[in-house]
Amino acid sequence: MSHIDTHSAHGPTGPGLESPPPHPAAGGHDAPPPVSPRRRRRHLSPLNERRWRNFRRNGRAFWSLVIFAVLFVLSLFAEFIANDRPIVVSYDGGIYMPVFNFYPETAFGGDFRTEAVYSDIEVQCLIRTGGLEDCFYEPDRLIAEGAVAEGAEGGWMIWPPIPYSYDTINDLGGAAPSAPDAQHLLGTDDTARDVAARVIYGFRLSILFTLIVTVLTSIIGIVAGAVQGFFGGWTDLIFQRIIEVWVSTPSLYVIIILFAILGRSFWLLVFVTVLFGWPALVGVVRAEFLRARNFEYVRAARALGVSNWTIMFRHMLPNAMVATVTMLPFIITGTISTLASLDFLGFGLPSSAPSLGELTLQAKQNLQAPWLGFTAFFTFAIMLSLLIFIFEGIRDAFDPRKTFQ
């Protein structure tokens, strides 16, 4: 009888039947609200959270990342920081954006259909006065008096903090290069271009070049090293012989020949650098996969029928990331040095490109202008130091001895 009462009190149970879950209020505690899949995806895994905490504890690496991120983001908006075109122009009640669009001089009451030279005093007078024809004769007086054409509205311009682009040739009134002054904070180079503007654009160019090359070389190197280490045998042997022949190819001669045939360009230089840079990671990744291929979890995955590519890149690659991340600082600094060296030798980007290597070459050719050498040196020193500190912190954060202590 007691057995029947107990059975009826708790509802039907038995094989294949489960009692209904208790009401949240029955136990005296509210059940936690369900977590949506979108919110779950936002959170890092416990392992990555430990790595992030370890990175945050490294003050030098964390603040280097902050400073570098700020500098890089600012350089992405270089056109709004250093440009020989105004950011916004108001002319006769209309708004123009010369940073993004082409406007002929006729759009502001001028005579030419070529692009307006906004630094010319005549063009500035036309914009400010609403298109007075006397701007071609007495622009300074009309601007000083604030004259406005009849029936028109006075205009205005908002300039970037540095009113010169990286390729703007300035009228110095003297010999170039010129020393730093109020108009050119870091002076000008030997073709009268503003050094500060070229440093801003050159920093962006160097970092973008380095990021593109590093990502592409890392992908190719990791895949090649993983295939060699995982499969071993003849696959490893053949790949190793190919790599030995490939790395013995004189890359500088190949670059000179390709540039002589195809001309110098940014993407061609990226292609050639990736072409000869991917073997840098192969040896490290190959060694990690050779070491891990006989571990128990790899054998278990094979026994369960997991595909080779899933084992390689979902299970084995995370364990090889420490050694891979350790090599990244060398790849990044090497890529920056490669770009600067090629530009210094004249085999890199076109001479008109805002390159830090070209600035270094100008410093060598103009020893009487020490500001060129100081600017190039401190730019390289700051950029490379920040990157090394950042990846040093990343390497420590990925170190299992610190992650699981």
Where are these regions (language model features)?
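Gly/Trp-centered helix-boundary motif
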Residues: 2-218, 222, 352, 362-378, ...
